[in-house]
Each structure stands twice: as structure tokens, then as C-alpha cells.
Amino acid sequence: LNKGKWNGQQILNENYFDQATTTSQNINLSYGFLWWLNGKGSCMVPTLQTVFPIDFIPNAPDDMFCGLGKDDQKVYVIPSKKMVVIRMGNAADSSSPALTAFDNELWTKINALYQ
């Protein structure tokens, strides 16, 4: 959030931040350096080799980037809303190790708060 600045002090190299939150290769436009990027128009989800013609999380803001962890642990960062959302707990759907329907449902509810 805030391109790596906290209280006016740069705590994360801004060049690294820019690279981490920018598409890192042409195979999967929705992937940076260990961060998943929304708003790219296509994505290849974890564990599949298929490119889907949709945003990574369609109901989330286009500028969102996120970290996905084991058992559905998530960190969503949305610079336009100055928001960080962390999801911890048991997997929302045990059939998928990372991305589940939970993500879109969560963003439908969060978006309703901003309307």
C-alpha cells in the first residue's frame, strides 16, 4: 500500500514494489513477482494451465493485488481504497488450494459497503 511508504518513510524499495505489482511475464498477465494482479483481462489460476478471459477476481477493484497462501489464506491490497484485507482461517473450499468462489463473494459484499 502507498508504494512501500509508511508515515512518509520509504520502507520497501519503490522499484521493487513497481516490478512486484506489474505483470512479470507473458504467460500469465495476472502474475507479478509473487503477487497476483487483478484487472488484467485474463488469468491463469493456480494449479491449472488454462488461460481464462476474465480478471483474476472479477468483483474486486482492478488495482487490487493479492497474495494467496495455503488453505485459502489471503492478503488483498487495494491502493485506490487505501485498504488491506487479510483472510485467515480454514479453507473456504477444500477442493481448491488457493482461489475459490469465496473471493468473488467477499468482494461483492465489500463493494456493497462503498455504494
Residue spans for each PLM region:
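Bacterial peptidoglycan biogenesis and beta-lactam-recognition machinery
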Residues: 1-12
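Structured C-terminal helix/loop/strand segments within mature extracytoplasmic catalytic/sensor domains
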Residues: 67-115
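Tryptophan-centered motif/residue detector
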Residues: 6, 35-36, 107
